[in-house]
Amino acid sequence: LQHIMDTSKEMHEWGNNHKQIIDMSDELLRKAKVQGFSDFQIARAIGYEGDMEDGILYVRNHRKQVGILPVVKQIDTLAAEYPAQTNYLYLTYSGVANDVKYLGDHKSIVVLGSGAYRIGSSVEFDWCGVQALQTIRKEGYRSVMINYNPETVSTDYDMCDRLYFDELTFERVMDILELENPHGVIVSTGGQIPNNL
């Protein structure tokens, strides 16, 4: 935790002395991403002035220009006892290569899940997501789900071709969409969170 606090302080100090993110060292930006800082948190830490949605894009565009991109890793469901080949995936900045190959053939469709259950959002949205995944497969496309709720049917290993067990935020969803290069994205089956994106 001390390293994270030190990085936050370093970004705040940097932001007090500079105005443009292009002046920030790639090393500091990479360290912040490896430690889990979102583009929003980085924009806020450096004192970005203006609309925060613009701030997120400001950091994102610079990060992509300098090659600071997440990689996709498979979740090891076998505790390293055997090599695991799963369709359970997550994104991280602590890696150098993707564990899966991307075809870029526009033959996949991404469904955004509902995330955690809460008042007004429960299994009915998961049912909608599962129905969408099944229909996508019937139509001959690869089905891709982004959801972080382990209690849902849509996160079962056999429900989709790829499951990104990751947060439903603009930054993370865009990272996945840029990798998948899908034919389409379905946001309407997950409730308010994906609709707000």
Regions found by a protein language model. Name each.
Residues L1-L197:
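ATP-dependent carboxylate/acyl-activation modules
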